[in-house]
C-alpha cells in the first residue's frame, strides 16, 4: 500500500556531465588520482624496504603525498568555477607526471618528501575536477556508487600487483596512467552548466500529481560535509599508511597479510552494495553513523594490539 505522504525526491535534469564520455573519463581520472591513496600500504612498505626509509620518514612521505592530495583539492575548489577544467586537468597531470618521474631519479629522503608533496598536489587537483564532474551529473549518487565499485576493484588490483613491482615501476605505473588519461582530455566538459547550491525537489501534489519546488541550501551545509570528510580521511589515511608496516612489526606472515588486504578491498564491494540498498530505505545519516561507530571500534581493537585475529 503506497504511503500517504511519500518522501520528496530530488528533481534531476540532464546536463553535459551526464554524457557517457564525461562519466567514463571522470571515473578513470578519479581512480588514477586516488591511486596512491588506494595503494599506500604497499607503497609505504616499498619506501621502507626498497629506499631504506625509517617508519617516521615513511609516515612523513606518505603524509606529504596525502596532504598534497588535500591541498590540491582545496586549490581546485578555488579555481574550478573560473578556469577551463580541461586546462586544470592538463596542468595538474603534468605536475603529477613530472613529480613521479623525478622520484625515479632522486631517491634521498628530502627530495622524495618534497616530490611526493608536489605529486600529491597535482593528483589532488586532477582528482577534485573528476569528483566535481561526477557530482555535477543529474544523478550524483549513482555516479558515486559506480565510482566506489570501480575503486574497490582498483584497490584490490593495487594490493595484488604493486608488491611485485620495484619502486621505479610503481612510479612508472602512475606516470603511464596520467599520460593515458590525457589522450581523452577532450571528453572533460570545460565549464560547469551553472553555479549555486540550490536544488529542485519533486513533491507530491493531490491535483497535479507532482510539483517541482525550488529550495535553498545553506552555505554551511557543504562546509560541514567537507569537515566530516576531512576528519574521516585523516583517520583512514593514518590507519591505511601504517597497517602493513604494523603487521610486519607484529611478525605476521607477509603473504597472508597481502592476501587479507586484497580481500578487504574486495569486501568494500559488498559494503557499496549494502550502502546502496540501505540508503534507499533509511536515508544516508543513520547508516553513516553506524559505519563510523564500527570504524572507531575496529581502530580501537587495533590500538590494543595488532594480531592475526584483529
Residue locations for each model-derived region?
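Helix-breaking motifs and short loop linkers at transmembrane-helix boundaries and internal kinks
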Residues: 52, 84, 105-110, 283, ...
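Transmembrane alpha-helical segments of major facilitator superfamily
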Residues: 60-69, 258-268
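Extracytoplasmic gate region of multi-pass secondary transporters
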Residues: 40-41, 220-262
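Paired small-residue
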Residues: 99, 110-119, 309-310
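Cytoplasmic helix-loop-helix junction between adjacent transmembrane helices
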Residues: 115-149
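Helix-loop-helix hairpin linking two adjacent transmembrane segments in secondary transporters
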Residues: 108-111, 137, 146-193
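Helix-to-loop junctions at the C-terminal end of transmembrane segments
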Residues: 72-85, 271-284
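Structural signature of the two symmetry-related core transmembrane helices
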Residues: 87-101, 286-301
Amino acid at each position: 500500500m503506497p504511503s500517504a505522504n511519500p518522501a520528496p525526491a530530488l528533481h534531476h535534469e540532464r546536463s553535459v556531465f551526464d554524457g557517457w564520455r564525461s562519466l567514463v573519463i571522470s571515473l578513470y581520472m578519479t581512480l588514477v588520482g586516488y591511486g596512491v591513496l588506494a595503494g599506500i600500504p604497499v607503497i609505504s612498505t616499498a619506501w621502507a624496504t626498497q629506499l631504506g626509509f625509517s617508519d617516521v620518514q615513511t609516515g612523513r612521505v606518505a603524509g606529504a603525498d596525502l596532504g598534497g592530495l588535500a591541498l590540491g583539492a582545496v586549490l581546485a575548489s578555488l579555481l574550478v568555477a573560473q578556469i577551463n577544467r580541461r586546462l586544470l586537468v592538463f596542468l595538474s597531470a603534468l605536475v603529477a607526471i613530472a613529480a613521479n618521474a623525478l622520484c625515479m631519479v632522486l631517491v634521498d629522503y628530502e627530495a622524495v618528501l618534497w616530490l611526493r608533496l608536489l605529486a600529491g598536489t597535482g593528483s589532488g587537483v586532477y582528482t577534485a575536477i573528476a569528483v566535481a564532474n561526477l557530482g555535477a551529473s543529474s544523478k550524483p549518487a549513482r555516479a558515486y556508487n559506480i565510482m566506489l565499485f570501480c575503486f574497490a576493484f582498483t584497490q584490490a588490483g593495487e594490493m595484488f600487483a604493486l608488491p611485485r613491482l620495484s619502486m621505479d615501476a610503481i612510479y612508472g605505473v602512475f606516470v603511464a596512467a596520467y599520460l593515458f588519461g590525457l589522450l581523452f582530455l577532450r571528453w572533460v566538459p570545460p565549464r560547469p552548466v551553472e553555479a549555486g547550491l540550490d536544488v529542485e525537489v519533486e513533491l507530491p501534489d493531490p491535483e497535479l500529481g507532482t510539483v517541482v519546488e525550488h529550495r535553498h541550501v545553506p552555505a554551511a551545509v557543504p562546509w560541514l560535509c567537507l569537515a566530516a570528510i576531512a576528519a574521516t580521511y585523516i583517520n583512514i589515511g593514518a590507519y591505511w599508511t601504517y597497517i602493513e608496516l604494523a603487521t610486519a612489526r607484529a611478525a605476521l606472515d607477509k603473504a597472508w597479510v597481502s592476501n587479507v588486504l586484497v580481500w578487504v578491498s574486495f569486501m568494500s564491494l559488498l559494503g557499496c552494495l549494502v550502502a546502496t540498498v540501505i540508503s534507499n530505505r533509511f536515508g544516508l545519516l543513520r547508516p553513516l553513523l553506524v559505519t563510523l561507530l564500527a570504524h572507531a571500534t575496529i581502530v580501537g581493537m587495533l590500538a590494543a594490539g595488532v594480531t592475526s585475529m584483529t
